[in-house]
Amino acid sequence: MSNENKVLKLGLPKGSLQDSTIDLFAQAGFHFSVQSRSYFPSIDDDELEAILIRAQEMAHYVELGAFDVGLTGKDWIIETDADVVEVADLVYSKASMRPVRWVLCVPESSSIQSVKDLEGKHIATEVVNITKKYLAQHGVNASVEFSWGATEVKPPDLADAIVEVTETGTSLRANKLRIIDTLLESNTKLIANRQSWEDPWKREKIENMAMLLLGAINAHGKVGLKMNAPKASLEKLMSIIPALRQPTISALADAEWVALEVIVTEKIVRKLIPELKRAGAEGIFEYNINKLID
């Protein structure tokens, strides 16, 4: 088959990760258009076909070969015991660029203080297998029931405790729940079907995708700064710039001046630019970075 006819089947997570995933792909250079009620986004790449599916099911379908590649959480790979290639760690979630946690929670008023106190108790969760393994590791015999959602409202009437995912802890606190322990820290992963990974064309396509997605994540919260400065001010400027890497210094037509370019975290720029100006920099301008590839 010629490369012109080859297509990589991509599974995108539907639900809480959908918007942040579409945004991440856009920053990486892949632009999806998702129509209302449609599970088949269009994309500006003729070599890709995408389908939206729940992250909980993604690893299973990638293992079966329904998708060549997909995005899901480390948690769901473990929960479904899927045999897939873990291509890249993509540390982002619904509302932030950090991992999520699966935590054991009880009502604030509960007398339960540790996992040992759950002997003979009832636990509700979406991650039944992860929870059962955790209890077994602690030698605790408790009932674990699958929860179809709204897990946080189940204690104390419908469950003694829950195992629930949290990003910030805000929802747990709002429901007056107290965290006893963390079972698992999880982040999004790019995964591939093992047979697809052995196909040279598909593997290169997947590896290129991984590189661009990681570059987009690495660029998060960072900007570039360019400026001109007299050589006499260079030492002082270098002491001010908190660079992720050494600044790039280029010669200018005027032998007494140089151009500097540097990547910094965006949150410090409002303080940094006035300091650079006072130290002798001129023509300072800031630009956004879509991808930062090591």
From Swiss-Prot:
GO molecular function: ATP binding; ATP phosphoribosyltransferase activity; magnesium ion binding
Keywords assigned: Amino-acid biosynthesis, ATP-binding, Cytoplasm, Glycosyltransferase, Histidine biosynthesis, Magnesium, Metal-binding, Nucleotide-binding, Transferase
Catalytic activity: 1-(5-phospho-beta-D-ribosyl)-ATP + diphosphate = 5-phospho-alpha-D-ribose 1-diphosphate + ATP
Activity modulation: Feedback inhibited by histidine.
An individual GO BP term: L-histidine biosynthetic process
InterPro entries referenced in this protein's UniProt entry, alphabetically: ATP-PRT_HisG_long, ATP_PRibTrfase_cat, ATP_PRibTrfase_HisG, HisG_C, N-reg_PII-like_a/b, N-reg_PII/ATP_PRibTrfase_C
Naturally occurring in which organism (per UniProt): Chlorobium chlorochromatii (strain CaD3)
Function description: Catalyzes the condensation of ATP and 5-phosphoribose 1-diphosphate to form N'-(5'-phosphoribosyl)-ATP (PR-ATP). Has a crucial role in the pathway because the rate of histidine biosynthesis seems to be controlled primarily by regulation of HisG enzymatic activity.
Localization per record: Cytoplasm
Protein name per UniProt: ATP phosphoribosyltransferase
Assigned GO CC terms: cytoplasm
Keyword flag Hydrolase: no
